[in-house]
């Protein structure tokens, strides 16, 4: 499943919150702010309290959009707290992926585990548990989970240089990269699965508004 949109909208919200903190005289370390906000999201409701960000900055093939407009939707009864806002923004990073995985599930494609990798997983145990709920499968993160694309490209270069004759990439990674890697695996929590499912239903409804705005 390929998704064009992930954390751009999340990053924009964190930047806005950083500007607010600076306005109040605080010195903001962006890395620490991300960590605090991610951990705060764990206090949010499993369904994000009716707060629904649509994180589309560009088109999305899975949901058939040629362009995107980031939006935030909520009802008068929604619990518009910072914890719910952050949780909803992280959920939205996985929403289109979850839609794509549901399509694969209908085609009887099954998953044993997913490997979480990239800056989204830098704060331990937050995005990892949300992805597990979204994908209905266990998610593993290594100590290097916070490293992004350059790390992956370096691994590919090392594979090209040092692989044994005929050795597949997966075998090389298991032998030379992940053999001694420290990792954690989280299985989906039933309450969070139900919460994400409720969020995803509202997200898909919100896509109707997104489609109208794009047009």
Predicted feature descriptions by range:
Residues 1-215:
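Active-site core segments that coordinate phosphate-bearing ligands/cofactors
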């Amino acid at each position: 499943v390929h998704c064009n949109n992930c954390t751009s909208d999340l990053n924009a919200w964190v930047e806005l919150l950083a500007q607010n903190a600076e306005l109040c005289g605080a010195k903001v370390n962006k890395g620490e702010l991300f960590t605090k906000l991610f951990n705060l999201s764990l206090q949010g409701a499993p369904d994000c309290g009716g707060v629904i960000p649509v994180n589309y900055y560009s088109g999305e093939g899975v949901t058939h959009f040629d362009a995107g407009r980031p939006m935030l939707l909520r009802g008068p009864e929604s619990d518009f707290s910072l914890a719910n806002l952050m949780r909803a923004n992280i959920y939205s990073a996985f929403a289109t992926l979850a839609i794509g995985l549901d399509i694969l599930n209908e085609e009887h494609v099954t998953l044993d585990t997913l490997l979480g990798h990239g800056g989204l997983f830098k704060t331990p145990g937050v995005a990892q548990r949300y992805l597990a709920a979204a994908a209905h499968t266990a998610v593993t993160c290594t100590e290097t989970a916070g490293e992004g694309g350059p790390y992956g490209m370096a691994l590919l270069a090392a594979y090209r240089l040092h692989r044994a004759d005929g050795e597949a990439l997966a075998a090389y990674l298991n032998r030379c990269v992940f053999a001694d890697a420290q990792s954690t695996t989280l299985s989906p929590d039933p309450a969070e699965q139900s919460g994400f499912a409720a969020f995803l239903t509202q997200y898909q409804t919100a896509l109707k508004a997104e489609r109208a705005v794009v047009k």
